């Protein structure tokens, strides 16, 4: 007899006679909806898309349950206390610049590549995009710069002139696939655990080079935070995993994101606080990229970037306007309000 499992996140039918301790993968916590973000109290995954929220894989393994569980309404505010683990209260008072300076590591390790997590929806979009698409078709050679790299994944050719078009392009027409630590391309069956070996895999198709020029993109981007994680979100259509990378050290972040149409978003910043690089990651979705930075110490950040970083960008005339969505207004001396701007203008007028 087949029974329906009522564990949250499962919903599968099972045979009671073959119900084992690892048969069910479910969420023991409760759903959390906060400022358009949706997730479970028992794990860190957050999304703004409701269908992706429903498809978040369970974080706990156990027995299937045939008894209907009592309904628990979604929690409308910040992270809930899980029945398995008591969470620490959010420290809403940002640390001062002096405290941040004392706590920053004295010696910096070189930035490391953060792992890229490709959503199932993006994988489908990339596979649809590759159908009947010949790279490099219709490109005007007069628009190609000498020294431009071929944009096809797996090809490292460099444009030296019209004669470069005569050389074959060996590339991967498919999309990258990352599953349970294994990395491969959808167009060929070679799988590897090492990310460097994955990038070095030779292409499986021969075609034309794609010398398309990458255009700087003015992408909308914002950030939000919880007690333990800071999330920087960059919005754009169809990020291309093969060309994207994000590097981070404990106090610095370097971002290079390529979207469909060869539009590129780049950013470099010193972070307000210290992060745990090993636990941080990047999630790629059809309409955005989320960079999740795990804080080294729980607490609130007054802003995303360190004051020194903002001052340097202001002097260079490239100050990035970041919109912090979740945290409350800070009384920190580093905050600058419109009223203070008006007072300064009046003082200068006198």
Curated annotation (Swiss-Prot):
Q: Write out the residues that bind Zn(2+) 2.
A: 27, 42-43, 59
Cite the CS domain residue spans from the record: 216-305
Stretches with biased composition (Polar residues): 80-92
Residue ranges spanning the membrane: these are none
Question: What Gene3D superfamilies does the entry give?
Answer: 2.60.40.790, 4.10.1130.20
Q: Which Pfam families match?
A: CHORD, CS
| Entry binding sites for Zn(2+) 3 | 150, 155, 169, 209
Q: In which tissues is it expressed?
A: Expressed in skeletal and cardiac muscles but not in other tissues. Is localized in rows flanking the Z line containing alpha-actinin.
Coiled-coil stretches: none
Induction entry: During muscle regeneration.
Keywords on record:
Metal-binding, Repeat, SH3-binding, Zinc
Task: Specify the superkingdom.
Answer: Eukaryota
Question: Which of this chain's residues are annotated to bind Zn(2+) 4?
Answer: 172, 187-188, 204
Q: Name one GO cellular component term.
A: Z disc
Map motif SH2-binding onto the chain.
159-162, 235-238
Q: Where does Zn(2+) 1 bind?
A: 5, 10, 24, 64
Occurrences of domain CHORD (ranges): 5-64, 150-209
Q: Where is this region: Disordered?
A: 72-92, 317-350
Q: Where is the composition biased (Acidic residues)?
A: 321-350
Q: Name one GO molecular function term.
A: SH3 domain binding
Location of the motif SH3-binding: 28-31, 70-79, 173-176
Cross-referenced PANTHER family: CYSTEINE AND HISTIDINE-RICH DOMAIN-CONTAINING PROTEIN 1 (PTHR46983), INTEGRIN SUBUNIT BETA 1 BINDING PROTEIN 2 (PTHR46983:SF2)
Q: What is known of its domains?
A: The tail domain binds to the cytoplasmic domain of both integrin beta-1a and beta-1d isoforms. The presence of Ca(2+) ions does not prevent binding of a fragment consisting of the second cysteine rich repeat and the tail domain but prevents the binding of the full-length protein.
* Quaternary organization: Interacts with beta-1 integrin subunit. This interaction is regulated by divalent cations, and it occurs only in absence of calcium.
Query: What the protein does?
Result: May play a role during maturation and/or organization of muscles cells.
Q: What is this protein called?
A: Integrin beta-1-binding protein 2
Species in which this protein is naturally found: Mus musculus
